[in-house]
């Protein structure tokens, strides 16, 4: 679709309403006026290489709430606004080289929003931009409760924490 709103039929076809017509959790997270209070995204552009950058800790920050579509769009916009774009001249044009590939930021943020653990109250997805890196934090650990440090990475199978969201 091309907007932030969904038609009623879409809610039914993607199992985002129950048999009584009430939104499921996935439906509520995708609704334009998301009723889920902890569907939030915190974004910060830090001054330096860590969260204590000297005289000024943060150069920019924003807190967004609303549907996952809104959070995704606002998060990508925040990163684009706060990253550097270098460029070099060629014989007949200019090549722009942004710090981060927009498609990669989009994909990482989609994964963070879709696969986060929404049962952890008082938590939110974070985007932190430093002078040398971008980090995206998503609440929740491994779906089976193990620690990733204790696992053989080659044997971890793909598991979707929120399958309805992942299907959409």
What are these regions (language model features)?
Residues 1-164, 168:
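Active-site helix-to-loop segments that bind/position phosphate- or nucleotide-bearing substrates
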């Amino acid at each position: 679709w091309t907007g932030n709103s969904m038609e009623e039929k879409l809610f039914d076809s993607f199992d985002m309403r129950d048999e009584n017509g009430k939104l499921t959790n996935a439906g509520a997270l995708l609704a334009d006026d998301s009723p889920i209070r902890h569907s939030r995204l915190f974004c910060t552009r830090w001054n330096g290489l860590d969260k204590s950058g000297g005289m000024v800790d943060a150069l920019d920050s924003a807190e967004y709430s609303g549907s996952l579509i809104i959070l995704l769009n606002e998060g990508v916009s925040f990163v684009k606004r706060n990253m550097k774009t270098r460029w070099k001249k060629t014989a007949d044009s200019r090549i722009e080289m942004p710090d981060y590939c927009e498609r990669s930021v989009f994909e990482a943020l989609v994964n963070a929003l879709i696969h986060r653990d929404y049962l952890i109250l008082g938590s939110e997805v974070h985007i932190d931009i430093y002078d040398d890196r971008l980090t995206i934090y998503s609440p929740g650990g491994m779906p089976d409760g193990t620690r990733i440090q204790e696992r053989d990475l080659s044997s971890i199978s793909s598991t979707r924490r929120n399958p309805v969201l992942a299907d959409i």
